[in-house]
Amino acid sequence: MVVQFSFPRELRLLTPHSFGFVFEKPQRASTEQITVLARINDLKHPRIGFAISKKNVKHAHHRNRIKRLTRESFRLHQHFLLPMDFIILAKKGVDKLDNQVLNAVLERLWRRYSH
């Protein structure tokens, strides 16, 4: 069987209801730069959403870079993750991390929610 590493629409949290579901009773995992809120879903696959505020990451290009790298990391780890809904919250200082360090931080966080 060939494993797909695509990132289709059904792997994203899109509606306010989906976000509210996670914010209601989240399981938290944190580092100094990122907090992951997670909650088991009824689907057979994980989904991801972002809440990266302008207050914590001033410039749009930094927010976009963080989301792009996080999406890519999620895409590569999706088959090892439990069927949960994830919301990524960025803290102050995350924009100072280079790509390798950010990937290492995300790797550590994904391990907490893998099979």
Curated annotation (Swiss-Prot):
SUPFAM superfamilies: Ribosomal protein S5 domain 2-like. The keyword Translocase does not apply. Keywords: Endonuclease, Hydrolase, Nuclease, RNA-binding, tRNA processing. Its EC number is 3.1.26.5. It comes from the Bacteria. Gene3D superfamilies: 3.30.230.10. One of its GO terms (biological process) is tRNA 5'-leader removal. It catalyses: Endonucleolytic cleavage of RNA, removing 5'-extranucleotides from tRNA precursor. InterPro entries: Ribosomal_Su5_D2-typ_SF, Ribsml_uS5_D2-typ_fold_subgr, RNase_P, RNase_P_CS. GO terms for molecular function: 3'-tRNA processing endoribonuclease activity; ribonuclease P activity; tRNA binding. The keyword Transport does not apply. Consists of a catalytic RNA component (M1 or rnpB) and a protein subunit. Belongs to the RnpA family. PANTHER family: RIBONUCLEASE P PROTEIN COMPONENT. RNaseP catalyzes the removal of the 5'-leader sequence from pre-tRNA to produce the mature 5'-terminus. It can also cleave other RNA substrates such as 4.5S RNA. The protein component plays an auxiliary but essential role in vivo by binding to the 5'-leader sequence and broadening the substrate specificity of the ribozyme. This is Ribonuclease P protein component.
